[in-house]
Amino acid sequence: VGQLNVWVFKINTKRGWEFDQYFRSRARGAYELGDEGWIRSASSLRYIREEVKRGDLFFCYEVDRKWVVGVARAASDGRDTGMGSLLDFCPPREAVRLKNPLVRHPDLDHILAFSPQRGRGTVQKIDRDEFARLRRLMLRKNPEQAEALRRLLG
């Protein structure tokens, strides 16, 4: 996967937005995600500004429901605050909404990016081994989406 990074983007749906609004959107172009009001954690803002690159992978995690509902790619580099959206996701039809989401227990048990110890930031980094594990799990739980997942996950 070259130099691409893998991230988790965490949201709490109780704030009135859920990832299905992205996955079900008819948007043909890139989808603007996140603004200053939405992401307050300094570490998340720094990751987005300095490290998120176009093509990076994002696991979409809903904290209150404790599951990964899908995967998307960044359609832009991360931006600094004050420039509108902090980052754009790929058009929804290029992303994958999992038929069988990965749940916190047991699927994500040993994956640090999802543990409370990793802090409360919206955006967290997923390391190589964790990504390999997540990829295997996704394919195992969603065999009928294997082709789309392989295309997206590489």
Give residue spans per PLM region.
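Small-side-chain structural scaffolding
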Residues: 44, 60, 70-72
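Aromatic- and Lys/Arg-enriched surface recognition patch
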Residues: 67-140
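Short, flexible beta-strand-to-coil junctions
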Residues: 11-15, 61-66
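Residues at structural and domain junctions
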Residues: 41, 58, 117-120
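Compositionally biased, charged N-terminal/linker segments
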Residues: 1-52, 102, 138-154
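Short coil-to-beta transition motif at edge beta-strands of beta-rich domains
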Residues: 48-62
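GIY-YIG nuclease signature motif recognition
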Residues: 9, 62, 72-75
